[in-house]
UniProtKB/Swiss-Prot annotation:
Chain intervals for the UniProt region annotation (Disordered): 25-62
GO molecular function: DNA binding; DNA-binding transcription factor activity; identical protein binding; transcription cis-regulatory region binding
Lineage: Eukaryota, Viridiplantae, Streptophyta, Embryophyta, Tracheophyta
Protein name: Auxin-responsive protein IAA4
Induction pattern: By auxin.
GO biological process terms on file: auxin-activated signaling pathway; response to auxin
UniProt source species: Arabidopsis thaliana (Mouse-ear cress)
Gene encoding the protein: IAA4
Motif (EAR-like (transcriptional repression)): 18-22
């Protein structure tokens, strides 16, 4: 046995051994059948001497995507928007044939007639009169809007509050292009 110890000292296998781990850390003895990791400080002898068979579990790693920050921020922003009355509901307004766009705040108006007067003054045109069955009569232009679903609808078809909450943009179209939007008289 002494020859083996002398050989180990001369060759110094431990110093030249290649292994994974940080330099200066001692190798831990682990059971070949267990899939659990052993803490580097605790060896089998220490575990047996203390009488404890379970080791303290490492702190739980945060699951990717948890907590759902994106949905939290989205909900938080929506509640802030509903709480603040000072913010306006700005939408773009375009008119067929006009080379420019405008942006208006829908919360400034109380009903459709106020909005129509403002649009007439802004773009210098006449809308005419709105009838529920026939749509807009007496004008070459018809105001339409895009709702939050992406559908184009006639301005005045829904109650004012619903219009203000669902309108994404306004477009004043030529009457010849509006035939499929729901008014039979055009």
């Amino acid at each position: 046995m002494e020859k083996v110890d002398v050989y180990d000292e001369l060759v110094n296998l431990k110093a030249t051994e290649l292994r994974l781990g940080l330099p200066g850390t001692e190798e831990t003895v682990s059971c070949g059948k267990s899939n659990k990791r052993v803490l580097p400080e605790a060896t089998e002898k220490e575990i047996e001497s203390t009488g404890k068979t379970e080791t303290a579990s490492p702190p739980k790693a945060q699951i990717v995507g948890w907590p759902p920050v994106r949905s939290y921020r989205k909900n938080n922003v929506q509640t802030k928007k509903s709480e603040s009355e000072g913010q306006g509901n700005y939408v773009k307004v375009s008119m067929d044939g006009a080379p420019y766009l405008r942006k208006i705040d829908l919360t400034m108006y109380k009903q459709y007639p106020e909005l129509m007067k403002s649009l007439e003054n802004m773009f210098k045109f006449s809308v005419g009169e709105y009838f529920e069955r026939e749509g807009y009569k007496g004008s070459d232009f018809v105001p339409t809007y895009e709702d939050k679903d992406g559908d184009w609808m006639l301005v005045g078809d829904v109650p004012w509050e619903m219009f203000v909450s669902s309108c994404k943009r306004l477009r004043i179209m030529k009457g010849s292009e509006v035939k499929g939007l729901g008014c039979g008289g055009l």
